Regions:
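SH3-family beta-barrel domains
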Residues: 1-18, 27-28, 37-40, 47-49, ...
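Intrinsically disordered, low-complexity polar regions and short flexible loop motifs
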Residues: 21
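A basic, amphipathic helix-loop patch mediating RNA/tRNA/ribosome contacts
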Residues: 24
Length: 131
């Protein structure tokens, strides 16, 4: 069975090999989805779903999505905003995707979205529903 993951940092380098000195072949933003090809101790070989790039990311830069078939697009960050994880705040870059599960909750449940971000999401959803 295929496994999938999601990037949980603002910006992540996709490396050609499983080490820090290898070439950066692409970058992924917060919320980008990928297929897990080969998990390892410190690095995981992945394939980005949006453009098909294959490379390695560090294991602490992503999290596994358990119910991949149950998620759908939530919104696209149209301005830079911050979210809080259990440990720190990170900035969501413009263009980052936020996904939801069937319960309409953001997939990244370990993150707390600020009131400002939630209001933008809600206003965007209501304007889309009216169309």
């Amino acid at each position: 069975m295929e496994s999938f993951g999601i990037i949980i940092l603002s910006q992540v380098s996709i490396k050609s090999q499983d080490n820090h000195r290898s070439e950066t072949i692409s970058q992924a933003l917060f919320g980008e989805l990928f297929k897990i090809i080969e998990p390892q101790n410190e690095w995981t070989k992945i394939q980005l779903l949006n453009d098909g790039y294959i490379g390695f990311v560090q294991n602490q830069q992503w999290m596994k999505i358990d119910n991949f078939d149950n998620i759908e697009f939530y919104c696209n960050a149209n301005s830079a905003n911050k979210v809080k994880s259990n440990l720190s705040k990170i900035r969501i870059p413009i263009g980052a995707n936020i996904w939801k599960n069937n319960g309409n909750h953001p997939v990244l449940s370990k993150f707390t979205f600020s009131k400002k971000v939630k209001n933008k999401i809600l206003s965007k959803q209501s304007s889309q529903k009216q169309v």
